[in-house]
């Protein structure tokens, strides 16, 4: 089992968790391919972390399985923006810590279409 950790990335943890849940349990090669076509900043970041985890363990991406994909909240950068009448309001710029574990395995996450095809006997 190999791991990769990316800390203090300027990315909202709630938005990144949406993508992280989708790739958990998937084959690493399939996950990287699907993330490549996802129009999201979190997808680009997660793709690089998954590739790094595969490389850290000297694994083959075709046989690697994403065991765990976790996105934790990092510190929040606070900035201020000037407003009317001399006031200023805060802007929160959240950061995240992305953690991916990859292990040797050949099972793939079953999708709805795959289950449907199996039920029909295709």
Swiss-Prot record:
One of its GO terms (biological process) is translation. Residues 102-122 are annotated as: Disordered. HAMAP family: Ribosomal_uL22_B (MF_01331_B). PANTHER family: CHLOROPLAST 50S RIBOSOMAL PROTEIN L22-RELATED, LARGE RIBOSOMAL SUBUNIT PROTEIN UL22M. The gene is rplV. CDD domains: Ribosomal_L22. Keywords: Ribonucleoprotein, Ribosomal protein, RNA-binding, rRNA-binding. GO terms for cellular component: cytosolic large ribosomal subunit. It comes from the Bacteria. One of its GO terms (molecular function) is structural constituent of ribosome. This is Large ribosomal subunit protein uL22. It comes from Helicobacter pylori (strain ATCC 700392 / 26695) (Campylobacter pylori). This protein binds specifically to 23S rRNA; its binding is stimulated by other ribosomal proteins, e.g. L4, L17, and L20. It is important during the early stages of 50S assembly. It makes multiple contacts with different domains of the 23S rRNA in the assembled 50S subunit and ribosome. The globular domain of the protein is located near the polypeptide exit tunnel on the outside of the subunit, while an extended beta-hairpin is found that lines the wall of the exit tunnel in the center of the 70S ribosome. SUPFAM superfamilies: Ribosomal protein L22 (SSF54843). Transmembrane segments: none annotated.
């Amino acid at each position: 089992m190999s791991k990769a950790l990316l800390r203090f990335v300027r990315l909202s943890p709630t938005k990144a968790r949406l993508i992280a849940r989708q790739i958990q349990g998937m084959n690493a090669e399939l996950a990287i391919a699907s993330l490549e076509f996802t129009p999201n900043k979190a997808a680009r970041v997660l793709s690089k972390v998954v590739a790094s985890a595969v490389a850290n363990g000297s694994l083959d991406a075709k046989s690697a399985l994403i065991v765990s994909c976790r996105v934790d909240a990092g510190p929040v950068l606070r900035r201020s923006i000037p407003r009317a009448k001399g006031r200023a309001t805060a802007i929160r710029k959240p950061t995240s810590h992305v953690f991916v574990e990859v292990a040797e395995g050949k099972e793939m996450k079953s999708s709805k279409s795959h289950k449907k095809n199996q039920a029909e006997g295709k």
